[in-house]
């Protein structure tokens, strides 16, 4: 019995290793199978920040992400509680082929660089006072808060993405509290 248990453990070990050896991609679903959508966006940002390209599969299973497998990525996904699948080259190629079909409204966007993000909001606001900063903070996506002084100093070219609240330019800012 003990010998059989040992053989089964060894077999399990080698099957696990061979599965990982064939696991060439990480697939991060963004449909109902995703346990934490916001953290998944943060993971995509984290992967880009580590100089690894990410394929954003537009309209495919909710706009899923896919990238080359690396143990560090798998570890980060587990730590952040993000649902993922380890898939083979063949499975990744099948997804890419399906996306390329003119019969579907899917597209693949290759992300190569993480954006430097700024949010235009008063410095006195806490992350929970603003929906955008709340989401970015929760997703663990770094951002800078800028306001009028930074714009007047000419700091806008430092950023790839600037989020502006429409009420800041329509005279509606502060009406909620008012």
Question: Locations of the language-model features?
Answer:
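Boundary at the C-terminal end of the N-terminal hydrophobic targeting segment
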Residues: 21-23
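Bacterial N-terminal signal peptides that target proteins for export
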Residues: 1-9
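Short phosphate-binding/catalytic loops that engage adenosine nucleotides
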Residues: 52, 82, 141
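Short N-terminal or domain-adjacent regulatory/targeting segments
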Residues: 80-113
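N-terminal, post-signal-peptide region of Sec/Tat-exported proteins
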Residues: 39-76
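Helical hinge/lid and interdomain linker segments adjacent to catalytic or ligand-binding clefts
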Residues: 25-26, 31, 35, 66-75, ...
């Amino acid at each position: 019995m003990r010998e059989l248990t040992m053989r089964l453990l060894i077999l399990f070990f080698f099957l696990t290793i061979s599965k990982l050896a064939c696991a060439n991609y990480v697939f991060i679903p963004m449909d109902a199978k995703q346990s934490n959508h916001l953290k998944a966006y943060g993971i995509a940002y984290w992967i880009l920040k580590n100089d690894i390209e990410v394929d954003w599969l537009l309209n495919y299973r909710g706009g899923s992400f896919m990238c080359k497998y690396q143990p560090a990525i798998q570890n980060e996904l587990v730590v952040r509680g993000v649902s993922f699948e380890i898939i083979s080259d063949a499975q990744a190629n099948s997804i890419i082929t399906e996306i390329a079909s003119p019969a579907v409204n899917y597209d693949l966007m290759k992300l190569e660089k993480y954006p430097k993000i700024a949010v235009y909001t008063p410095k006195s606001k806490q992350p929970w006072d603003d929906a955008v900063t709340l989401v970015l903070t929760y997703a663990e996506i770094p951002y800078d808060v800028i306001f009028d002084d930074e714009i007047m100093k000419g700091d806008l070219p430092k950023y790839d993405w600037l989020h502006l609240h429409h009420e800041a330019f329509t005279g509606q800012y502060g009406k909620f509290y008012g």
